[in-house]
Design a protein with these regions (language model features):
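N-terminal DNA-binding recognition helix of tyrosine site-specific recombinases/integrases
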Residues: 1-11, 62
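Conserved tyrosine-mediated DNA breakage-rejoining catalytic core shared by Y-recombinases
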Residues: 14-15, 61, 71-107
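Long, amphipathic, Lys/Arg-enriched alpha-helical "connector/arm" segment
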Residues: 19-50
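Active-site/catalytic core of tyrosine-dependent DNA strand-transfer enzymes
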Residues: 33-34, 98-159
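Short, basic (Lys/Arg/His-rich) helix/loop patches that form interaction surfaces
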Residues: 39, 43-46, 146-186
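Short pre-functional
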Residues: 52-65, 174
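Short, polar N-cap/turn motifs at the start of nucleic acid-interacting alpha helices
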Residues: 75-81, 158-160, 179-198
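Catalytic-site neighborhood detector that most strongly recognizes the C-terminal catalytic loop/helix
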Residues: 86-90, 125-126, 188-213
Length: 218
């Protein structure tokens, strides 16, 4: 692409040599581990308390991505629903706001003006028309949130690497066989149901476990 080598002589790409990268292992938290996080006695207003709120809100709303969480504004919340446009694919999403999310929102509602209209304060003061500045702020915030999530994991005695993105995997893990793949596709806003099936395959293991037991339990 940079003109360093003629495309005809470039050995990689479509219909040529293709490098296959190993599948990443997706690990989500269990229901018990989420409960442990929920039940932590954290000081109101502390970094850990705030980080837990951001992470749980993401999880409660079907694992919405960190950029979408941090860019959520109060004006996006109307009639008991969150309506926003996904950063990744620009699809419009409308989700009912669960009671647990309403509780989190109540902590931040008094600061809506101070936070520049955002639910969370990470993007206050950032020029939203400057996409590079917004992206940089989100990356920095994500790094900070992940740092405090490590502390939360330690406090909750969870031996897993918890990150903001793990909230999405956690939703997938807990939803398991509880929700149809068609409904999960809508919640995730995947373009193809195949994408949803492949994603959930990382977490749904009951059928495999039952099949294994059926063979060796004699």
């Amino acid at each position: 692409k940079e003109g360093i080598i003629d495309n005809k002589n470039y050995p990689f790409g479509k219909d040529k040599i293709q490098i296959k990268f190993p599948e990443s292992i997706k690990i989500g938290l269990t229901q018990e581990e989420v409960l442990a996080i929920e039940q932590l006695d954290l000081t109101v207003g502390s970094k850990e308390w705030h980080t837990r709120n951001v992470w749980l809100l993401s999880f409660y709303l079907a694992g919405i991505r960190v950029a979408d969480v941090l860019e959520t504004k109060w004006e996006d919340i109307q009639d008991g629903r969150l309506r926003y446009r996904m950063n990744k694919n620009q699809k419009v999403v409308s989700l009912k706001i669960p009671d647990k999310v309403l509780t989190i929102l109540s902590y931040y509602e008094p600061y809506r003006a101070l936070n520049g209209g955002y639910v969370f304060p990470e993007l206050k003061g950032v020029d939203e028309k400057d996409s590079k500045a917004v992206l940089a702020a989100i990356r920095n915030a994500n790094k900070t949130l992940n740092k405090y999530l490590k502390r939360i994991a330690k406090l909750a005695k969870i031996n897993k690497n918890i990150t903001m993105h793990i909230s999405r995997h956690t939703f997938g893990n807990i939803s398991g066989d509880k929700i149809s793949v068609q409904m999960l596709q809508k919640l995730y806003r995947h373009s193809s149901i195949t994408t949803t099936v492949n994603y959930q395959a990382n977490f749904i293991s009951k059928d495999i476990d039952d099949a294994l037991d059926a063979v060796i339990d004699f």
